[in-house]
Amino acid sequence: MGNCLHRAELSPSTENSSQLDFEDVWNSSYGVNDSFPDGDYGANLEAAAPCHSCNLLDDSALPFFILTSVLGILASSTVLFMLFRPLFRWQLCPGWPVLAQLAVGSALFSIVVPVLAPGLGSTRSSALCSLGYCVWYGSAFAQALLLGCHASLGHRLGAGQVPGLTLGLTVGIWGVAALLTLPVTLASGASGGLCTLIYSTELKALQATHTVACLAIFVLLPLGLFGAKGLKKALGMGPGPWMNILWAWFIFWWPHGVVLGLDFLVRSKLLLLSTCLAQQALDLLLNLAEALAILHCVATPLLLALFCHQATRTLLPSLPLPEGWSSHLDTLGSKS
């Protein structure tokens, strides 16, 4: 995906013009210095050329966006059907309402992927792009918070365990996720027909807030869960957060949070990159981290399916069946 652009080559006219201007200033200010090496002058002129990076997610990456979106929608829809299917064993999964919300978040992300994909025309409005980024990050923030609650509360999230707990968490988590998306919604728009984040001095506060939100949700939250798990185990204070296969979700977003933080430091000139190669490496990491984050909408339904399969196979013999399930099983037993 993408076409790599190497260091810009100066045209003969540009090179001659630059050389003439440089020599005029040098001669008038310091006099002619015949000992100035030609090689050093060429190296300095080459170093002053613009630094171009390889954009992996350009127009040629459109098939990747479309395929990921289609697969994500199909996989999320299948998981939602299984979770809401009457008298299906996946409804016995601990905290299945939270799992259903994870599938909804993954489906929302999958739907909005084509909106932000390059190569789908040049008439997209800033409002559509802002809405796309709002759903993009809002669904991701909500999924991360849902995973944190599912790991911390575990079996107490089951239907009927704590009255009103699931509803309260649902409203709170999606409300917080919506608030966290306000900075990126206001700092995004359309430029040259592409949806992009707008970097400017006026929007620097919004960009900083968005970066902090990504670092907190995608980087610090999983680190906090791992830390709490290890600390409680070391101190003998109980099992700690419930570790399961769903934690693999953070693998897809953790690099995005880290690289986004580095990019903000570079743009704010708090971290200086001395070479063009370092800037190209950072741009490449940004593209790779974004591509990995996009793939989560396909991986999340698979993780949910694997978790529900493992949980029901392990917990089904020890879980009390709801009344509807008991009568259904009794009917099946009498028929046999």
UniProtKB/Swiss-Prot annotation:
Residues 1-63, 117-129, 188-207, 266-287 are extracellular. CDD domains: 7tmA_ACKR1_DARC. The modification Sulfotyrosine is found at residues 30, 41. Sulfation at Tyr-41 facilitates interaction with MGSA/CXCL1, RANTES/CCL5 and MCP-1/CCL2 but not IL8/CXCL8. Sulfation at Tyr-30 facilitates interaction with IL8/CXCL8. It is found in: Early endosome; Recycling endosome; Membrane. One of its GO terms (molecular function) is signaling receptor activity. Changing residue 30 to F: Abolishes sulfation. Reduces binding with IL8/CXCL8. Changing residue 22 to A: Significantly reduces binding with Plasmodium vivax Duffy receptor (PVDR). The keyword Disulfide bond applies. Changing residue 11 to A: Does not affect interaction with Plasmodium vivax Duffy receptor (PVDR). Changing residue 18 to A: Does not affect interaction with Plasmodium vivax Duffy receptor (PVDR). A subset of erythroblasts from genotypically Duffy-negative individuals transiently expresses ACKR1 during terminal erythroid differentiation and P.vivax merozoites can invade these ACKR1-expressing Duffy-negative erythroblasts. Atypical chemokine receptor that controls chemokine levels and localization via high-affinity chemokine binding that is uncoupled from classic ligand-driven signal transduction cascades, resulting instead in chemokine sequestration, degradation, or transcytosis. Also known as interceptor (internalizing receptor) or chemokine-scavenging receptor or chemokine decoy receptor. Has a promiscuous chemokine-binding profile, interacting with inflammatory chemokines of both the CXC and the CC subfamilies but not with homeostatic chemokines. (Microbial infection) Acts as a receptor for the malaria parasite Plasmodium vivax. (Microbial infection) Interacts (via N-terminal extracellular domain) with Plasmodium vivax Duffy receptor (PVDR) (via PvRII region). (Microbial infection) Interacts (via N-terminal extracellular domain) with Plasmodium knowlesi Duffy receptor alpha form (DBPalpha) (via region II). This is Atypical chemokine receptor 1. It comes from Homo sapiens (Human).
